[in-house]
Amino acid sequence: MLQPKRTKFRKVHTGRNRGLAKGTEVSFGSFGLKAVGRGRLTARQIEAARRAMTRHIKRQGKIWIRVFPDKPITEKPLEVRQGKGKGNVEYWVAQIQPGKVMYEVDGVPEELAREAFRLAARKLPFKTTFVTKQVM
């Protein structure tokens, strides 16, 4: 699963997930999966979607993952009273804003890419859309 090798700080504030995304264009492949909604994407969800796509397109083409989970999420253990400091880091998330291209694929027909992205989108917690590279 994806997570940073080292970080400056172990724990971060919860913060908010506002604004619009950077990385809104398909830049590496021919087709992309773009977020329509906003939310948190866990490392497990990123990996589950990647596996679904990889299994469908088999060994053809190439897949790019354009998101990285760099925010630690902490949780306190079950049945522990409040206080006594912040909980331990349980998992890592990537914060996703609308318009972010999360996955790209190249070297496969459009129909195959569409179906692979449809399978991947079922693993994600917000709405997505299929996009193609803009040729000028």
Swiss-Prot record:
GO CC entries: cytosolic large ribosomal subunit
CDD domains assigned to the protein according to its UniProt record, in alphabetical order: Ribosomal_L16_L10e
InterPro entries the UniProt entry points to: Ribosomal_uL16, Ribosomal_uL16_bact-type, Ribosomal_uL16_CS, Ribosomal_uL16_dom, Ribosomal_uL16_sf
Keywords for the protein's UniProt record, in alphabetical order: Ribonucleoprotein, Ribosomal protein, RNA-binding, rRNA-binding, tRNA-binding
Top-level division of the source organism's lineage: Bacteria
MF-aspect GO terms: rRNA binding; structural constituent of ribosome; tRNA binding
Pfam families: Ribosomal_L16
Disulfide bonds: none
One annotated GO biological process: translation
PANTHER family assigned: 50S/60S RIBOSOMAL PROTEIN L16, LARGE RIBOSOMAL SUBUNIT PROTEIN UL16M
Function: Binds 23S rRNA and is also seen to make contacts with the A and possibly P site tRNAs.
Family recorded in the similarity comment: Belongs to the universal ribosomal protein uL16 family.
Subunit composition and interactions: Part of the 50S ribosomal subunit.
Name by which UniProt lists this protein: Large ribosomal subunit protein uL16
Organism of provenance: Vibrio vulnificus (strain YJ016)
Lineage, uppermost ranks: Bacteria, Pseudomonadati, Pseudomonadota, Gammaproteobacteria, Vibrionales
Gene that produces this protein: rplP
